[in-house]
């Protein structure tokens, strides 16, 4: 008995249908995988954005610390304590190795609210926060660009703070919880050493803040405060301090403040308050806040007078040079990063 042969045309149609079926299946699989990858990438992007926003808020808080807490506060360069009890507020004071969740907000002495991060606020997936011993605001430590960070990320030291966003729950973790080990894996759940990449062990996303990153805007704020004091000196004396000693006295109020300017003013009948003679130079001028000397900024400030109304200041541990000009509120700088 002869069986009917399938013609070449029919064979081609059959093969085309099989290929189409396989292609459709593989395309569907590819779309599922691609969609999953897109979802994962979108989630990672949101997490990275949240970490960067929280980092920016902490750095801005550190830069403006002297303005937020007054002249006798810890001063610029300090960071808030973590939230250790889960109420979304910082818990002070914090001891060495401070570690907890990042505060959602900070209540200032004025009762105003400083927002830090509302990422996953009200849930157990908030960002975790490690704070270097040397940059705590309460109790205050001496903070300036020469002070090293005590935290390490991926084998590199010098971090002032580390932010960690937890991933999905893994085997052995129990949530909700107030224990770091239920959210963070390996060395990331406490201590001073952190890892940012090791998919085989954990799914945390890590963002460190280096001392240089923290101190770049902080030094700019300190330079602005120095500029205000030197402007006050210039208004009374008609020039910037000529020597290092004059510079230090101008900033701290030592040496009678203005020096010889008082005598000149007195000769004109005390028109500018100069009747007080050489001791006051027309009366006391502005001086730097207490935090300036408390944090050793004076000892680490390099002053260079260029001419009567122009000078530069720089700070040990930071390679930015700031140029101050009398009567000019803006300050030129050689770089944006230490």
Residue ranges and their predicted role:
Residues 1-2, 40:
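Elongated, non-catalytic scaffold/linker segments and compositionally distinctive motifs
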Residues 2-35:
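N-terminal single-pass transmembrane signal-anchor helix
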Residues 28-338:
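N-terminal pilin/flagellin-like segments and related low-complexity appendage regions
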């Amino acid at each position: 008995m002869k069986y009917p042969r399938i013609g070449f045309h029919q064979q081609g149609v059959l093969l085309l249908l099989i290929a189409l079926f396989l292609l459709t299946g593989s395309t569907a699989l590819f779309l599922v995988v691609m969609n999953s990858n897109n979802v994962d990438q979108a989630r990672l992007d949101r997490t990275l954005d949240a970490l960067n926003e929280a980092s920016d808020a902490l750095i801005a808080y550190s830069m403006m610390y002297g303005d937020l807490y007054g002249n006798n506060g810890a001063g610029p360069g300090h960071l808030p304590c973590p939230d250790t009890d889960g109420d979304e507020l910082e818990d002070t004071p914090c001891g060495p190795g401070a570690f907890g969740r990042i505060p959602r907000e900070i209540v200032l002495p004025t009762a105003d609210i400083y927002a830090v991060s509302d990422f996953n606020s009200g849930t157990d997936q908030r960002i975790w926060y490690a704070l270097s011993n040397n940059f705590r605001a309460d109790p205050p430590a001496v903070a300036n660009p020469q002070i090293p960070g005590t935290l390490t990320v991926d084998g590199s030291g010098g971090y002032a703070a580390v932010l960690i966003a937890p991933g999905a729950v893994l085997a052995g973790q129990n949530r909700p919880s107030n224990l770091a080990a239920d959210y963070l894996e390996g060395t990331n759940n406490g201590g001073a050493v952190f890892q940012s990449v090791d998919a085989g062990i954990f799914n945390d996303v890590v963002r460190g803040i280096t001392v240089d990153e923290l101190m770049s805007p902080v030094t700019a704020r300190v330079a602005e405060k120095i500029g205000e004091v030197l402007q006050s000196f210039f208004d009374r004396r008609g020039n910037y301090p000529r020597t290092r000693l004059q510079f230090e006295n101008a900033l701290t109020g030592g040496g009678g403040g203005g020096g010889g300017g008082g005598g000149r003013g007195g000769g004109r009948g005390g028109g500018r308050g100069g009747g007080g003679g050489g001791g006051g130079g027309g009366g006391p001028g502005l001086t730097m806040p207490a935090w300036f000397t408390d944090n050793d900024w004076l000892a680490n400030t390099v002053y260079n007078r260029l001419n009567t109304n122009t000078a530069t200041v720089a700070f040990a541990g930071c390679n930015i040079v700031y140029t101050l000009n009398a009567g000019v509120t803006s300050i030129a700088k050689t770089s944006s990063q230490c």
